[in-house]
């Protein structure tokens, strides 16, 4: 078992720091989280780095501050690289870090609705049946739960008229979710048990992606972003409390 992969608090903590603009020294807290994640498991480091890179590009290019963008990259990468070096990340050749599995250990397009894609094929729902998927997709387990799924559909009904404005206002989060989802799906995309896309990547792309061969794990930040923003939107829209009670009961 990969016990270190249970440190999902790193993802939640990073999202909290990113969302809460009232926190002082947010950038340095992010640096600490990303650097510390390298001491736990590199998959968390890769996820947080990717999210941080997109957020940083968006914020700094929005303000047209290229100098600050480069400064942030430097201040992040120096402690991260030094930490990784000190614990032995670079003690083996890069070629030895490449692995088999990218395109196999991935997520399914229906992962958020599939209650039985996890370890041991346990069904985590009393209401939804198993959705057939392909071999290796247990790594991309991201079942949201019936309650959250219903909540998301309720929210879509409430915000459909202003959806374009909401996307524009929170575009950086939509970009992050889309990019993470593409990585999680890999180059072999399945919809349930149906494989709809399967192609070979050129070696210059496959080589670095094979380092994160279990790309399905990149569904985790999306999972938490969807839950956090669904609950936040529920509160902001002042939806009747009885809906929330019902959602909690069936979650």
Predicted feature locations:
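Specific aromatic-rich, kink-prone transmembrane helix
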Residues: 7-29, 226-229
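Hydrophobic alpha-helical membrane-interfacial segments at the cytosolic entry of transmembrane helices
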Residues: 64-88, 99-104, 108, 172-179
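Hydrophobic, aromatic-rich transmembrane alpha-helices
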Residues: 145-167, 178-182, 230
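Membrane-interface helix-loop junctions at the exits of transmembrane helices
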Residues: 1, 84-93, 115-124, 174-213, ...
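Membrane-interface micro-motifs in multi-pass membrane enzymes
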Residues: 1-13, 39-43, 47, 142-144, ...
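Perimembrane helix-loop-helix junctions
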Residues: 18, 46-78, 155-166
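Membrane-interface alpha helices of multi-pass inner-membrane proteins
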Residues: 16-17, 27-45
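Periplasmic/ER-lumenal interhelical loops and adjacent helix-loop junctions
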Residues: 83-158
